[in-house]
Design a protein with these regions (language model features):
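Conserved PLP-enzyme active-site core in the AAT-like
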Residues: 6-179
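Helix-enriched interaction subdomains in cytosolic or periplasmic regions
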Residues: 2-3
């Protein structure tokens, strides 16, 4: 659906931003083995994305959740440290602003701070719940969406538009331009 396409688009921008312009010419063959971080609650689009981008599903490091099924940031930090020690490049953390099965909202502010410290792309899958950020009663973590490098939204969930209405928001528009522009 539109949400899957929006999320994949955001991770393509992350791949280009982190691995550089050479990834377009050389593919992944000269790139370090990369890792993506997400919980088991993350929608299945992520497996599709890493497969389509040539990383393979083994590039996903699954982060534990807390009792509310939100990403455990202590475990996330440990996973990142362990992967760095093993020689992997932490490429992106994927948080959920409302999971499909439970509506759980990951601790966005804490994840953003960790990603900033670690210099890792921070993506939010907001297809299911990001639209709720406009509500005065929105949870504090939904009010922090602007801390992400990219956010995917899907207007057919809450905004009553037809399917294939995915949207990608990025902190720096040049990441999308650099990813998809071709010189003629």
């Amino acid at each position: 659906s539109g949400g899957t396409v929006a999320n994949i688009t955001a991770l393509l921008a992350a791949r280009r931003a982190v691995l550089g312009a050479e990834v377009r010419r050389d593919g992944l063959r000269n790139s370090p083995q990369s890792r993506f971080y997400a919980t088991v609650e993350t929608h299945a689009w992520l497996e599709k994305a890493v497969d389509m981008m040539g990383f393979g599903e083994a590039a996903i490091t699954r982060v534990e959740t807390d009792a509310q099924l939100r990403m455990d940031t202590v475990h996330l930090a440990a996973c990142i440290a362990e992967d760095r020690k093993a020689g992997y490049l932490p490429l992106a953390v994927v948080a959920s602003a409302g999971t499909v099965s439970t509506g759980a909202i990951d601790p966005i502010k804490a994840i953003a701070a960790l990603c900033c410290r670690e210099k890792i792309w921070f993506h939010i899958d907001g297809c299911y719940g990001a639209a709720a950020a406009i509500l005065p009663s929105a949870p504090a973590d939904l009010q922090c969406l602007g801390l992400a490098d990219s956010i995917a939204m899907d207007a057919h969930k809450w905004l009553y538009v037809p399917l294939e209405a995915g949207c990608v928001l990025v902190k720096d528009k040049n990441h999308l331009v650099d990813t998809f522009a071709h010189e003629t």
